[in-house]
Amino acid sequence: MLILTRRSGETLMIGDQVTVTVLGVKGNQVRVGINAPKHVAVHREEIYHRIQRGDELACSSGTRGDSGSSI
C-alpha cells in the first residue's frame, strides 16, 4: 500500500486519467473529489461490497442484477 500525505486542496494522480483531490478535513472525516472517465467505476467500499453481493445473488438465481445503476 502506498501511503501519501496531502493537504486540503492538493491532488494526486492515479494513472493518466484519474485525479483525487482533498477538498477538506474536519475532525476524522476527509472529503475527497474524484475525477475519472465514465468507464471507471468509483464507489465507497461498503457500496462496492453490496454491489458484489448483489451480483453473486443474481448469478446464483440465474438472473442478472442491476449493477450498472448509480449509487
From Swiss-Prot:
Entry keyword annotation includes Cell membrane: no
Any one GO BP annotation for this protein: negative regulation of translational initiation
Protein name: Translational regulator CsrA
Primary localisation category: cytoplasm
Localization (cell): Cytoplasm
GO molecular function: mRNA 5'-UTR binding
InterPro entries: CsrA, CsrA_sf
Subunit structure: Homodimer; the beta-strands of each monomer intercalate to form a hydrophobic core, while the alpha-helices form wings that extend away from the core.
Family: Belongs to the CsrA/RsmA family.
Annotated function: A key translational regulator that binds mRNA to regulate translation initiation and/or mRNA stability. Mediates global changes in gene expression, shifting from rapid growth to stress survival by linking envelope stress, the stringent response and the catabolite repression systems. Usually binds in the 5'-UTR; binding at or near the Shine-Dalgarno sequence prevents ribosome-binding, repressing translation, binding elsewhere in the 5'-UTR can activate translation and/or stabilize the mRNA. Its function is antagonized by small RNA(s).
Keyword list, A-Z: Activator, Cytoplasm, Repressor, RNA-binding, Translation regulation
Entry GO terms, CC: cytosol
Gene: csrA
